[in-house]
Amino acid sequence: MAGIPHDHYEPKTGFERWLHRRLPIVSLVYDTLMIPTPKNLNWWWIWGIVLAFCLVLQIATGIVLVMHYTPHVDLAFASVEHIMRDVNGGYMLRYLHANGASLFFLAVYIHIFRGLYYGSYKAPREVTWIVGMLIYLMMMGTAFMGYVLPWGQMSFWGATVITGLFGAIPGVGEAIQTWLLGGPAVDNPTLNRFFSLHYLLPFVIAALVVVHIWAFHTTGNNNPTGVEVRRGSKEEAKKDTLPFWPYFVIKDLFALAVVLVVFFAIVGFMPNYLGHPDNYIEANPLVTPAHIVPEWYFLPFYAILRAFTADVWVVMLVNWLSFGIIDAKFFGVIAMFGAILVMALVPWLDTSRVRSGQYRPLFKWWFWLLAVDFVVLMWVGAMPAEGIYPYIALAGSAYWFAYFLIILPLLGIIEKPDAMPQTIEEDFNAHYGPETHPAE
């Protein structure tokens, strides 16, 4: 798909022309900052800059933290305490890094759900969406391995439980688990591997972010209406767009400042609110915590993992059909990874010709029920797997898969969309034009 017509950088001085012929970096920066952006973007589109800030924060604080960290089972916990007590500003660096991960995931979940609501995955933006899902998977892997590094009780037992999932794969599971751990159990080789990968993956994420930005700069940004920018000429495109600089940069920086006020308040006044007290106890393989839970951003999928027990009829059916090869544990692993995979497949599961949920009356109800379902699964994932909680988790898991595999494909067939604006300019004038906001 051709890019949006716009003015490109033209070198004016002799030096600029000389540099442009050899390294057109000024042109690259100009085209990035001055890219035409739909003028009707709302606050849902501010989270990109929050994500960029979080990535830079995590890499910067992480680099300093590893200068003082020792990846050895006998020294890791003590080295973290050394950072907290003896390194100048060490406690602040650690709290920024830990809470920065939470802000990172909060922003990415809002970013994903915004994309699901406004149809940012639909053609021609499928590649942008898939690269975004790859970034999310890399974030999950990086965060999990980072959670193991402090070598507290929850770090150790969380690693034991999650790596144990690979052992559920029939036939080759135990061999894969041993290969991942570097031995029969979570120990020093595991810690060293996780430390190395935790340091490496943020740079892989940064590279994928560049590809992600490149992809949506090629196709153009989506917008609340889902209507494409007119591309017949520069004049037409200018009626639907504004340059990214200064309009959206200033808006995004203001939004980032508001988010950071809340973020630094949490870091300064309740930095351990989202953590777990058991992780301030050094790892002990002989003492199992009463309740093993991952970080909050993994809880929805952890709830799905635990929801499918041996007494669930669908598990019993699959177990019987597979001649006992797929047991409840392996079924839970499939369900957990499948819950993430269906989000990557949503460009082909959504059959509606209308991109934005703003004009889909039936879709809105099912979508917001999905958002509630996600929060409920997060809550259930933090609860013990007893009493009514497994039933709630099972119901939440069922709706999650039903939404993507049944409801979304059917809605595109049966739903009658509302009237849509023909252009972004029309939508913008309807909301922000002089008729809408008359001068006083």
Curated annotation (Swiss-Prot):
GO terms for molecular function: metal ion binding; ubiquinol-cytochrome-c reductase activity. The chain crosses the membrane at residues 46-66, 100-120, 129-149, 156-176, 194-214, 253-273, 296-315, 330-350, 365-385, 394-414. It is found in: Cell membrane. Keywords: Cell membrane, Electron transport, Heme, Iron, Membrane, Metal-binding, Respiratory chain, Transmembrane, Transmembrane helix, Transport. PROSITE patterns: CYTB_CTER (PS51003), CYTB_NTER (PS51002). It is a multi-pass membrane protein. Heme b b566 binds at H111, H212. GO terms for cellular component: plasma membrane; respiratory chain complex III. Gene3D superfamilies: Cytochrome Bc1 Complex, Chain C. InterPro entries: Cyt_b/b6_C, Cyt_b/b6_C_sf, Cyt_b/b6_N, Cytb/b6-like_sf, Cytochrome_b, Cytochrome_b_C_euk/bac, Cytochrome_b_N_euk/bac, Di-haem_cyt_TM. One of its GO terms (biological process) is respiratory electron transport chain. The keyword GTP-binding does not apply. Binds 2 heme b groups non-covalently. Its cofactor is heme b. The keyword RNA-binding does not apply. Heme b b562 binds at H97, H198. Its main location: membrane. Component of the ubiquinol-cytochrome c reductase complex (complex III or cytochrome b-c1 complex), which is a respiratory chain that generates an electrochemical potential coupled to ATP synthesis. The main subunits of complex b-c1 are: cytochrome b, cytochrome c1 and the Rieske protein. PANTHER family: CYTOCHROME B. Heme 1 (or BL or b562) is low-potential and absorbs at about 562 nm, and heme 2 (or BH or b566) is high-potential and absorbs at about 566 nm. Belongs to the cytochrome b family. This is Cytochrome b. It comes from Paracoccus denitrificans. The gene is petB.
